[in-house]
């Protein structure tokens, strides 16, 4: 269970294809009226490790930040064709259920040929009292 807050899709030149989630995330954040600092859990698909590292570098997030892929990413869990988006959402939904103090989470992935897709989600279990 989650509530979709906003989403963004963007494309970059194929030569830098792994960077697509950066502009898609910027679009999603702008639509939501949020900043990267409002996001408490990041589920980033890592078909290639450099994709996640580039994303983290762009947004000044440490590569060992515990908010990033806390249950493991595609390198640890696998990267089956057409299953990544569902895996990201399921992992985030479970983390929301376990962490009611977390309000916003983000799923992002490179979707091929320079495209990036990002969705910002709100935790339906959120409670400021936690």
List where the protein language model places each region.
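Claisen-condensing/thiolase-fold acyl-transfer catalytic domains that form or cleave C-C bonds
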Residues: 1-130
């Amino acid at each position: 269970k989650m509530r979709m807050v906003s989403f963004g899709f963007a494309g970059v030149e194929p030569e830098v294809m792994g960077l697509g989630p950066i502009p898609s995330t910027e679009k999603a954040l702008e639509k939501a009226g949020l900043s990267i600092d409002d996001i408490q859990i990041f589920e980033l698909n890592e078909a290639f490790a450099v994709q996640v590292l580039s994303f983290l570098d762009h947004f000044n997030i440490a590569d060992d930040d515990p908010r990033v892929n806390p249950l493991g990413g595609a390198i640890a869990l696998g990267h089956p064709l057409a299953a990544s988006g569902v895996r990201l959402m399921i992992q985030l939904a479970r983390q929301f259920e376990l962490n009611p103090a977390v309000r916003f989470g983000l799923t992002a992935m490179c979707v091929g040929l320079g495209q990036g897709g990002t969705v910002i989600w709100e935790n339906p279990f959120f409670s400021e009292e936690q």
